[in-house]
Amino acid sequence: MKFDTVIMGGGLAGLLCGLQLQQHGLRCAIVTRGQSALHFSSGSLDLLSALPDGQPVTDITAGLDALCRQAPEHPYSRLGAQKVLTLAQQAQTLLNASGAQLYGDVQQAHQRVTPLGTLRSTWLSSPEVPVWPLSAQRICVVGVSGLLDFQAHLAAASLRQRDLNVETAEIDLPELDVLRDNPTEFRAVNIARLLDNEEKWPLLYDALSPIATNCDMIIMPACFGLANDTLWRWLNERLPCALTLLPTLPPSVLGIRLHNQLQRQFVRQGGIWMPGDEVKKVTCRRGTVSEIWTRNHADIPLRPRFAVLASGSFFSSGLVAEREGIREPILGLDVQQTATRAEWYQQHFFDPQPWQQFGVVTDDAFRPSLAGNTVENLYAIGSVLAGFDPIAEGCGGGVCAVSALQAAHHIAERAGEQQ
């Protein structure tokens, strides 16, 4: 099977890369093993929240300039501030075209409210998510009886520290009792599958309506809206106060929705989606990828002109930690890591951890190296890259988006030259 590009990994980076390549008229396939990290995320995307020295970032342009000085090997630093902003804006356009109407500005970070009621600087958020400063003084944090993925009293306690009048309440929906037989089934995603049925909408409205008459804003867990935000908009039009949603413990409704929107758009535009499959071997000849072998296709290889590695970091097994060191399991690419295992981590848990910055070594075009030699038609994007800390620096989503589009543009340019 011949393709212009085969992408190994179906997370945020892989999907955005595929969508951008389709804009250039290239035929793409994505090989994906299972759920991506988006399923376990908040559904919001960070661009740059803090510098390596811990300084918080509000002005993105100034932050990127400072990042270039502090961390010259960071993926953003390789591109330069203006290029990062341009690619981030293009990524936002791609997301919106896929139906993910995310709110945000590449020039200025905003503060979203987290499930614990604290604030986190971010780039893009779903319109349902409350953004600081809140537009209300009287707030009610509403939980769902029996839902363990969201603790209303914890969120309320944090918000009260910001001089807000915050109460808590709990709604009980007997229609959800079918899920209560097994506590592990009473999760936000399973609740959403029931509540997204249009016949159930009035039941949720009836439960929230008495609470809404006594406050200016309701904050509740995101336990509906797996496919779209239609129910949220329907409720906001009818309730006498604003309704906002907070992501829950994983799996996340908002994260799953974002992934599904991107995946459906990729397939709609003619992309080949290979779910439940796994790349077992990649054949390289004369410094280029020639064949990709997958578990499901056995002796039928995929033959791409270009290949993209978007396999993620440790969470997605894109990187594997072993006693002797860190390795990239598909091709055995060169990995940036510390000299000894003792240097992988810091003693204090909440300090920035060195292992977060481990990843494959690439050139400035994000082409990785194998035994010191660049693989000419292979690109590495997203969390598998080295040189950044997605947690401490708050840049995970941004690095995925920016590196994906940079690789896609580079591939499209080279593909045009080869025709």
Curated annotation (Swiss-Prot):
InterPro entries: FAD-dep_OxRdtase_2_FAD-bd, FAD-oxidoreductase_2, FAD/NAD-bd_sf, G3P_DH_GlpB_su. The keyword Ligase does not apply. GO terms for molecular function: glycerol-3-phosphate dehydrogenase (quinone) activity. It is found in: Cell inner membrane. Pathway: Polyol metabolism; glycerol degradation via glycerol kinase pathway; glycerone phosphate from sn-glycerol 3-phosphate (anaerobic route): step 1/1. One of its GO terms (cellular component) is plasma membrane. Its main location: membrane. GO terms for biological process: anaerobic respiration; glycerol catabolic process; glycerol-3-phosphate catabolic process. Keywords: Cell inner membrane, Cell membrane, Flavoprotein, FMN, Membrane, Oxidoreductase. It is a peripheral membrane protein. Its cofactor is FMN. Composed of a catalytic GlpA/B dimer and of membrane bound GlpC. Belongs to the anaerobic G-3-P dehydrogenase subunit B family. Conversion of glycerol 3-phosphate to dihydroxyacetone. Uses fumarate or nitrate as electron acceptor. This is Anaerobic glycerol-3-phosphate dehydrogenase subunit B. It comes from Salmonella typhimurium (strain LT2 / SGSC1412 / ATCC 700720). The lineage of its organism: Bacteria, Pseudomonadati, Pseudomonadota, Gammaproteobacteria, Enterobacterales.
